[in-house]
């Protein structure tokens, strides 16, 4: 959730959770984190059977490389030859430790109190070089495992997916009509 304050989000979330609970009292409910899933909504820690959803798109330069919609009609620019994982950019080093610390620091207040975290959205755009994507994903999935975080890719099929992604740097096999 982006663009609303915590009080507003809490009020709406509680109302929706109340309605769901009337139909299914023990259902696990996934609640999107604040600021596009980058941090927890701590005010709901008193509600049983919920998990909050984070994102796994850091750094955006890797996950959304050359995605036209990120900065309006101009895709983010970075020399493709310099795109790597680990990555040095803007005077910073992006590596496994960066991924670990970014997730752990943002969600520690929630998980330290027993809150469940599920990264319900992550992946790399088809313009990110395949070898870079694989190294980044290996580190990211390792961090999820280390922190005990459940996960789901943004999509199975499409520009962030593992099938029908339109990548030009992968030799595809046919799988039931998909590549």
Each model region followed by its residue ranges:
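Non-membrane alpha-helical structural segments and their capping/turn regions in soluble enzymes
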Residues: 6-14, 96-100, 131-134, 138
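Active-site region of glycoside hydrolase catalytic domains
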Residues: 1-93, 104-124, 146-149
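Aromatic-rich peripheral "rim/lid" segments of glycoside hydrolase catalytic domains that contact
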Residues: 129-179
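Phenylalanine-focused residue identity feature
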Residues: 78, 98, 118, 122, ...
């Amino acid at each position: 959730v982006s663009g609303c304050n915590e009080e507003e989000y809490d009020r709406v979330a509680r109302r929706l959770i109340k309605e769901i609970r009337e139909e299914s009292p023990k259902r696990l409910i996934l609640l999107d984190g604040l600021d596009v899933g980058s941090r927890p909504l701590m005010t709901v820690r008193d509600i049983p059977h919920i998990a909050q959803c984070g994102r796994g798109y850091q750094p955006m330069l890797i996950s959304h490389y050359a995605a036209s919609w990120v900065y309006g009609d101009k895709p983010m620019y970075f020399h493709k030859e310099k795109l790597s994982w680990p990555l040095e950019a803007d005077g910073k080093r992006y590596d496994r430790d960066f991924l670990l610390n970014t997730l752990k620091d943002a969600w520690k207040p929630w998980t330290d109190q027993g809150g469940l975290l599920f990264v319900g959205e992550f992946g790399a755009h088809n313009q990110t070089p395949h070898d870079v994507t694989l190294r980044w994903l290996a580190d990211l999935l390792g961090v999820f495992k280390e922190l005990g975080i459940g996960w789901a890719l943004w999509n199975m099929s499409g520009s962030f997916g593992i099938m029908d992604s339109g990548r030009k740097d992968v030799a595809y096999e046919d799988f039931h009509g998909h590549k």
